[in-house]
Amino acid sequence: VCDRDLVIPQERFSRDGARDLQDQIWRIAQSQGAEAFKPHKGSYIEDDHLPFLRAGLKVVNLIHWPFPKSWHTSGDTIDRCSADSLQQVGRVISEFIYRQGEPL
């Protein structure tokens, strides 16, 4: 979640299993102007979150999609990271966690 050209669509397994949490995260992102969080539905991405969803736990996968060409290659280096992208994700998730004690 730190690519310079970060794009985080609404991953579909998360949408199916934790729509309410995903909606909360995207509302926070919108209110903060976090442009990396895109309002469109993404793809079904098989990733580490699936066992949790299958166990009945609500989880949301925040993942850059489509994967950049450098993803998991020798070109996937620190210079491709962006402090702004990390800050957007960090602020959104911090606010999401903070709000968990509040009524919806």
Task: Annotate the PLM regions.
Residues 2-104:
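Active-site-adjacent substrate-binding region
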